[in-house]
């Protein structure tokens, strides 16, 4: 089967079925451009990520997981901005036209696309080392997009879920001798390969007036620093309040903390909001009306002393400053 037949069989036909149900997509695959209709009062949110074999996923990762995760992590960016998914494009580079790979890749891709009712509206394929580039488009009300730069003094810092499990999965993939007989490896691999974009948070992030947010892709500390840098603030983090993944529970305490603080690939949301709005969210959670969130610290004014030290985060245990060393080395792209 030739390239165009493969694309039609595994991508075009499925995307056109979804497009018929997606009001924002005026024209999908089949012309020189897609046409997207954004409702009056909304703005378009756009994000792009590229995934390279050997850099962002292991060579033995199954193609279903590659397709699934490639879209999931882009959807996570939309969730962090408070945007609802509309459409996406796919640029796929393959070393050869392996139909088995393409079939499983597309099945993983559309498994999550269908879950969130997002349409594939265009893209490209070419020959070369395996890579996947996805651009997602979403919509959010004008003036309500949630940015990194909005954190305010005394905001509560929250995360949407447990941290560190996916990073442990990466470590196990590098050292496979630790997989055999490990009761936590399956949990860790599932968290690594099949992240859950937190679209369920979006309406609540608007309802409770979240001031700043981003998704945790490169490690909690490294990503929190983006909020602090953009907002010109500092933070206090209570170590005992960091939610640890169940996949870590058999590891020493220091290792658990390191994976949770620095590991990355969690794709939970880190966000800040006022104390008043945090308490309202918690009240609704207790009555079953809102998702669970975890309070991990607070935003502080950036003092000259912290600027000179180049350190925007202070750790506390039971409210007292921590004197012992805590690793702060999150993932770096270069």
Tell what function each PLM region has:
Residues 157, 161, 194-220:
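Internal active-site segments that recognize and position negatively charged phosphoryl groups
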Residues 63-87, 104-115, 222-227:
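Small-aliphatic-rich amphipathic alpha-helix that forms the alpha element of a beta-alpha
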Residues 35, 74, 82, 120, ...:
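Residue-level signal for inorganic ion chemistry
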Residues 61-65, 187-195, 211-212, 257-259:
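Short pre-catalytic strand/loop immediately N-terminal to key active-site residues, enriched for Gly-Thr
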Residues 1-62, 81, 90, 334:
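Extreme N-terminal cap/leader segments of soluble proteins
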Residues 176-196, 247:
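A short, charged helix-loop
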Residues 10, 51, 84-174, 298:
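Glycine-rich anion-binding loops of enzyme active sites
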Residues 2-18, 42, 95-119, 126-130, ...:
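Glycine-/charge-enriched secondary-structure boundary and capping motifs
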């Amino acid at each position: 089967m030739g390239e165009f037949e493969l694309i039609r069989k595994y991508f075009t036909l499925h995307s056109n079925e979804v497009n018929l149900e997606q009001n924002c997509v005026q024209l999908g695959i089949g012309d020189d451009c897609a046409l997207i209709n954004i409702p009056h009062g909304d703005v378009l949110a756009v994000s792009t990520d590229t995934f390279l074999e050997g850099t962002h996923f292991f060579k033995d990762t199954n193609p279903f997981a590659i397709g699934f995760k490639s879209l999931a992590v882009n959807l996570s960016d939309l969730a962090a901005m408070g945007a609802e998914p509309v459409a996406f494009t796919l640029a796929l580079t393959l070393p050869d036209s392996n139909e088995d790979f393409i079939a499983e890749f597309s099945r993983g891709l559309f498994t999550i696309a269908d879950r969130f009712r997002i349409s594939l509206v265009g893209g490209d394929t070419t020959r070369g080392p395996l890579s996947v580039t996805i651009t997602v488009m979403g919509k959010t009300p004008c003036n309500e997009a949630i940015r990194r730069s909005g954190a305010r003094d005394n905001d509560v810092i929250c995360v949407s879920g447990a941290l560190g499990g996916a990073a442990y999965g990466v470590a196990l993939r590098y050292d496979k001798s630790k997989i055999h007989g490990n009761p936590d490896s399956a949990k860790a691999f599932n968290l690594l390969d099949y992240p859950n974009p937190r679209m369920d948070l979006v309406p609540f992030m608007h309802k409770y007036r979240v001031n700043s947010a981003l998704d945790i892709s490169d490690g909690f500390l490294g990503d929190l620093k983006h909020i602090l840098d953009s907002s010109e603030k500092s933070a206090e983090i209570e170590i005992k309040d960091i939610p640890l993944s169940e996949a870590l529970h058999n590891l020493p305490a220091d290792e658990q903390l390191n994976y949770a603080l620095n590991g990355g690939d969690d794709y939970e949301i880190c966000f800040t909001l006022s104390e008043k709005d945090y308490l309202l969210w918690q009240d609704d959670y207790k009555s079953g009306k809102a998702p669970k969130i975890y309070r991990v610290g607070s935003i502080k004014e950036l003092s000259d002393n912290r600027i000179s030290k180049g350190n925007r985060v202070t750790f506390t245990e039971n409210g007292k400053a921590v004197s012992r060393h805590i690793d702060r080395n999150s993932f770096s792209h270069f």
